[in-house]
Amino acid sequence: MSRSNTATLDSRSNRFVLTHFVWRQIASLAGFVLVGALALAIAALSTWNVADPSFSYATSNEPTNLLGYGGAVFADIFMQFFGLASVVALLPAVAWALVLIRGTHFDKVLKRLGLWFAGSVLASAALSCVPAPITWPLPNGLGGVFGDMILRFPALFTGTFPTGTFATVLACLFTAPAAWCLVYSAGLIGVSEDEEAEPAPEPAPSKARTIRDELEEEDEEGPLTVLMGSLAHMRYTAQARLRRAFGMGAKPAKRQYDEPYDFNNDEFGTLNEPVRPKAQAGRIEPSLDRSERRIVTPPPIMGDEDDPPFDIDERRPAGILPDDDEDDVAADWAPRPAPPKPALAMAGSRVAPPRPKAGQRVEREAQRSFVDEDGDFTLPPIHFLAEPKNVARDASLSADALEQNARMLEGVLEDFGVKGEIIHVRPGPVVTLYELEPAPGIKSSRVIGLADDIARSMSAIAARVAVVPGRNAIGIELPNQRREMVYLRELIGSRDFETTKTKLAMALGKTIGGESVVADLAKMPHLLVAGTTGSGKSVAINTMILSLLYRLRPDQCRLIMIDPKMLELSVYDGIPHLLSPVVTDPKKAVVALKWTVREMEERYKKMSKIGVRNIDGFNSRVEQALAKGEAITRTVQTGFDRQTGEAVYETEEFDLSPMPYIVVIIDEMADLMMVAGKDIEGAVQRLAQMARAAGIHVIMATQRPSVDVITGTIKANFPTRISFQVTSKIDSRTILGEQGAEQLLGMGDMLYMAGGGRIQRVHGPFVSDTEVEEVVAYLKTQGVPQYLDAITEDDEDENDGGGPAGTSNLADSEDPYDQAVAIVLRDGKASTSYVQRRLGIGYNRAASLIERMEQEGIISPANHAGKREILVPTEAEITGR
């Protein structure tokens, strides 16, 4: 009987070993498959781009995702529903893969999956409490659709999405249960109820005898019975395992044993040998880590050398369980889940909100400063600029609100007889672009003419309508209910501004889609800026200047600032980049422009002698010569020898000093044109036509974009223009050649026209006076400006007085009134049009001069024919005497 029982036990053990080995291999294979799936998911999420084709965005462009279209769709679905919590949702899967690779599997599968989903949703809700940055491309928050859905419940009581302290409290309340759910679903916590009851005591020595007695009481079975029993046992075991794996099995009842089984002792090993009690020091509690439990290696089940090796702690012997409890057999024979590891404890940690793509400059400023080669000058640190504020996202930019507005806009257009479909919506920080694909036969001019009607019907302040270049669509731009502010710091510290290869990079602002706009003044090569008072023109000039100061040293770029208003640019007086003090006198402004023209001509002579075509070639040649320790020379013929008649040559050596860029900034062109229009226009025209190769560039701004200020000559030589808000369509056409600037919103909202004529809407950044003053104060500590007196000193004998036909009497005084009186007394003509033509000024200015002469008794009031008499002796009368 004993031998028969031993044979039966041996066959059962062999079947168990084989079944267990197969299941371990399947689990390991599933673990590696899960690792591969995780790698693909991480690759898809890391290369996610909102502009890739997906279920929520239709485009003909090729996907930029690393996994192609499938990866783009997967990443879009996860980002749309979970937001940044998609990364957190993948962490439990990492723990699952590690456990499966070890050949084990989890119990309570459905419960863990449910807690995983709940934890991911709660993590999304916690992230949605964090205000989304202005660079967030999705209409939902950082937690996606699920996060916004959870926050709608507290919003029912507060009336709006949680913000401030309330949002922080909610984020903490969501984070704790989310962390617990994710950690539990990963298998890092959640010990079975049997193991949590109490530590298992040491097995009694009579346990082996009890098992032996039970085996001896069994009837002797033949080979056929053993085979059929084995097949039935394998069938029921597999069935119970599958039912438990998919959650279809009933929860095992809590079982009570006379003496609980100790994993460190193997009763089957004691069937043929006496039981030796273990020492207390070798006892391992079930709650400890698996690696610690494997310190004590138990003997094999049967002690035979032919048995395959496997871990004794990953199975339980069948002899100690009732034969009629098949579900419990499968449950107890199942591999135990791996205990938690410290490396996976971050599964429930909170993910920080994303920041705008900052460049390396922001990171390097904490380590070292930007110092030039000589170590004398340090570029200003970026912390002088204000940080962007975390503003709660606009509820009107949600997907539902945008879809509703698109349908409403289609209805408005259909009311005016324009049929079409809104094919795409691009929400931005200030305005939202709705791309309309008109029906065949609809003219774009017809839709553009409905801009005011569209704004009225949509209850908007203004609406701008323009054709989208390169697409069969018409763009309709409507302002957002809540306007987001663009800060200069996020543009200066962005990767686009830092990594650009442009020479004179200027941060202009952000597009409708939130992309940074960095323009190169060296390629423009000159810039015309126009806009009414309060439109953001002066702030834009400050941002352009700060962009140059944050990127270039004084030996690389020098500035000449002309500010007739004496308020806007005077704050920069004293920085090392200036070639002269800020020019506020209009007469000295003419002198400064003429010096710039002479400097341009001198640079052309130098470049011609060396044989280069532009300033970059000149500086490159100088750097190469300095690196090699050579001198740049040129051999020229100076004449002939009188005795031999041979040509005489001399070697001319050039000064090896690189030429910096020169940027001339004119803040108010209208005032200069009023005082000395012809001289200003002539100097600006020469600079605009020729100064590009010499490294001299002009930024000219005006608040009166009329044809007498922005003349045809100036427009022809300034292909790059920026228009802020203007008052009429005529002014918009004067600047850009088309309407649209009158529909801008002000406060930095601009239309940027590059050299090719393509117009782009840009939202300019804001920089306060305090930020400018701090940067200027820092630059003043870096060095003293080296002014050139020749810039504002006129050594030439000028007799034109600013007009085309002036005489020597006009040069005696710099006052326009004295010049006008001299013209009237000399020529004997006292009319407004005559004074206007002689002085080259505007009609209103000339009329005011005539009225002043009348008040001072120089001329008489106009008679019925408009004629005026000169009441004082004229120059001809005095000469005749």
Swiss-Prot record:
Residues in FtsK domain copies: 514-733
Cytoplasmic side: 190-881
GO biological process annotation, one example: chromosome segregation
Gene Ontology terms: cellular component: plasma membrane
Positions with a binding annotation for ATP: G534, S535, G536, K537, S538, V539
Region (Disordered) residue spans: 194-221, 339-362, 793-813
Gene3D superfamilies: 3.30.980.40, P-loop containing nucleotide triphosphate hydrolases, Winged helix-like DNA-binding domain superfamily/Winged helix DNA-binding domain
Domain of life: Bacteria
Keywords of the record: ATP-binding, Cell cycle, Cell division, Cell inner membrane, Cell membrane, Chromosome partition, DNA-binding, Membrane, Nucleotide-binding, Transmembrane, Transmembrane helix
Coiled coil: none
InterPro entries linked: AAA+_ATPase, FtsK/SpoIIIE/SftA, FtsK_4TM, FtsK_alpha, FtsK_dom, Ftsk_gamma, P-loop_NTPase, WH-like_DNA-bd_sf
GO molecular function annotations of the record: ATP binding; ATP hydrolysis activity; DNA binding
Main location: membrane
Compartments where found: Cell inner membrane
SMART domains in the record: AAA, Ftsk_gamma
TM helices/strands, residue ranges: 26-46, 81-101, 114-134, 169-189
Membrane topology per record: Multi-pass membrane protein
Role played: Essential cell division protein that coordinates cell division and chromosome segregation. The N-terminus is involved in assembly of the cell-division machinery. The C-terminus functions as a DNA motor that moves dsDNA in an ATP-dependent manner towards the dif recombination site, which is located within the replication terminus region. Translocation stops specifically at Xer-dif sites, where FtsK interacts with the Xer recombinase, allowing activation of chromosome unlinking by recombination. FtsK orienting polar sequences (KOPS) guide the direction of DNA translocation.
Domains as described in the record: Consists of an N-terminal domain, which is sufficient for the localization to the septal ring and is required for cell division, followed by a linker domain, and a C-terminal domain, which forms the translocation motor involved in chromosome segregation. The C-terminal domain can be further subdivided into alpha, beta and gamma subdomains. The alpha and beta subdomains multimerise to produce a hexameric ring, contain the nucleotide binding motif and form the DNA pump.
Oligomer and partners: Homohexamer. Forms a ring that surrounds DNA.
UniProt family annotation: Belongs to the FtsK/SpoIIIE/SftA family.
Protein name in UniProt: DNA translocase FtsK
Organism: Rhizobium meliloti (strain 1021)
Record gene name: ftsK
